Each structure stands twice: as structure tokens, then as C-alpha cells.
Amino acid sequence: MINTIIFDLGAVLIDWNPHYMYRTIFNDEEEMKNFLASVTTSDWNEEQDAGRSLQEGTDVLVKQFPEHEANIRAFYSRWEEMLGDAFWDTVEIFKELKESNKYKIYALTNWSAETFPVALSRYEFLNWFDGIVVSGTEKMRKPAPEFYQILLKRHNVKPEEALFIDDNLRNILAAEKLGIQSIHFTSAGLLKDKLKQLDVLQ
């Protein structure tokens, strides 16, 4: 029986997108996309999510791509401009789960420890969680099984009693290998349907 819900944050509850900031720098959309795909890549950003300092991450990239120094430094100096609004349809589902008083609800997020306080101050609903495990603080990230285990052990969660929600299939598969039932998030509407199918929501 499910008694614990574990949410991912980015792309599920919070809209974070580097395009929002870099569109103010690049006049050409394709040029911007090429920069994000080849310079400030997802793999590079995930190193900071896993605990590398923003300063070190920036310095490594500037050394590798000195011709892009200004635009690389903008990634974290203007990081807050990459934050969009909350995904309010999903927040409403979170609220409904919270108000049912049936579940402990946690967040398991790949997020830099240095930028996460900005999100905490901006999105009030983050205070609704019974606990948040941040990759940058723990120095490891999804899909490492040890990262999931931190949450399970810290909050005395049994895998078979938990439900995990994430937009990244890689992270879903890792959770399922640990025996955690999971929902691959694609939209708030489909999430609500699946939660009803599981009798998690009425």
C-alpha cells in the first residue's frame, strides 16, 4: 500500500529553462541552441548538481571554451532568470495529496546546493514537503541508486510503499530497479489519471 509520494521538481513542479535567459543574449535561436548543446551542456550542469562548485564548473568550461567566456559566466551569474513559473496544475495535485493527510510527501531533486536556496525563497509550496533531498548537498544525483537510498533511509521509507514521479525516464528506471513504483511524468492531466488508477487520488 502506498503511503509515501516522492516528487522530482524540475519540469514537474518548477519550470526551469536556460532558454529564458539566453534568449536575451543570442539573437539567433539556432545559435543559442548550439551553444547550449555544445558548451553549457546538460552533462556539464549535472556536475554542479552532483556537488561541484559553480565556480569550479564555470572555470573548467571557460578554460575549455575561452571564446565563449562571457556567455559561460552568464549561466550562473544570471541563473535566476532561467527560473519560470511553477507548473500550477501539478502544484494543485501536490496540494490535493497533501490535504488528504494520507501520505508523507518528499522531493528528490538534482539541483545545485548553491542555487537551491533561490528556489526555496521563490516557490512557497516547497515548504509543504515533509523533506527535500538535494543532490548538490549530498554530492550525488539521480540516477545513482545511492541517492535514492539516502531519502529512503533518512525518512524510513520502504520502497514498496513509495510512489516516485519524475519526467526523466532514466530516473524512473533507476527507481523501479530499487522496487519503487514510478510514474513517468509527461503532463499534469496524465499524472492525475494515473494517480486515480492507483487509488492514490479519488
Language-model regions, residue ranges each:
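Asp-based, Mg2+/Mn2+-dependent phosphohydrolase catalytic module
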Residues: 1-5, 112-113, 120-202
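N-terminal helical cap/lid subdomain that shapes the substrate entry/recognition surface
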Residues: 2-92, 112-115
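Generic structural signal for small/hydrophobic residues in well-ordered secondary structure
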Residues: 8-11, 51, 97, 107, ...
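Alpha-helical elements of Rossmann-like donor-binding domains used by nucleotide-donor carbohydrate transfer enzymes
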Residues: 20-21, 43, 56, 60, ...
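Substrate-recognition/cap helix-loop segment adjacent to the acidic, metal-dependent catalytic center
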Residues: 26-29, 90-137
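Secondary-structure boundary motif
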Residues: 63, 67, 96-102, 125, ...
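Glycine-/small-residue-rich active-site loops that bind phosphorylated ligands and cofactors
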Residues: 82-85, 104, 139-140
